[in-house]
Regions:
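Central antiparallel beta-sheet cores of small beta-barrel/beta-sandwich binding domains
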Residues: 3-5, 70-207
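Amphipathic/hydrophobic helical signal segments and adjacent flexible N-terminal regions
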Residues: 1-79, 89-93, 202-207
Length: 207
């Protein structure tokens, strides 16, 4: 959950990691040339190997552990991985029309790791991809929101009335109400907006 850390902490961690990594590489170089690197550099090497192992294991097993112990998700951020289906209701009106667009069947695919998240939305006419994401947890009320900016690419056959565009959106989970439902809203540079209501295709093993 790297994105949940304050920016100052991120900078400090990156800086410290860079120093430790450089020292560890120097220790390896000295070791393989038969010279003594000294205790500090060997310590940096050990820390680097240990940290890399922890990160690797966390990437593999964090969400499995969080599934068994849901409390972990309420203290970090819920596991949003999966395929979500539902309806998008838009204020968009086709050129020359005053009639709002009818509800659109929508599929959202979320891929989340400890360090990253990506969101893809697919409808019958277009596909959008997230390009920047931001986690916004409300731990007190157990509401979890992810904001993201996106680029939308309509299929060629629909571009006469729906041009490529960019926008920003959020998806929100109310942990106490339904862990397999997301609601949200989007705004785009065409001046339209809309609401999303999605349900996760549930794995029988998921709690």
């Amino acid at each position: 959950m790297w994105a949940l850390l304050p920016q100052r902490w991120q900078v400090l961690i990156i800086g410290a990691s860079a120093v430790i990594l450089v020292t560890a590489i120097d220790a390896l170089a000295l070791h393989f040339t038969g010279r003594d690197a000294g205790p500090l550099k060997y310590l940096s090497l050990a820390v680097t190997i240990f940290t890399a192992g922890i990160v690797f294991l966390a990437q593999l097993f964090w969400f499995k552990a969080a599934e068994l112990i849901p409390w972990l998700q309420t203290k970090t951020f819920p596991d949003l991985n999966g395929t979500w289906t539902g309806v998008l209701r838009s204020t968009y009106k086709a050129p020359g029309s005053d009639t709002p667009w009818p509800p659109i069947d929508t599929t959202v695919t979320i891929k989340q790791t400890l360090l990253t998240i990506s969101i893809t939305l697919q409808s019958g006419e277009s596909k959008s991809y997230s390009n920047r994401e931001h986690f916004e947890p409300d731990y007190r009320n157990k509401h979890f929101r992810v904001w993201y900016s996106y680029s939308n690419e309509p299929k060629a056959e629909f571009r006469h009335r729906s041009a490529p565009h960019d926008g920003v959106a959020y998806l929100e989970m109310d942990w106490e109400v339904d862990r397999n439902r997301l609601t949200g809203r989007y705004y785009n540079d065409r001046g339209s907006s809309g609401d999303l209501d999605l349900k996760r295709k549930v794995n029988p093993k998921r709690r």
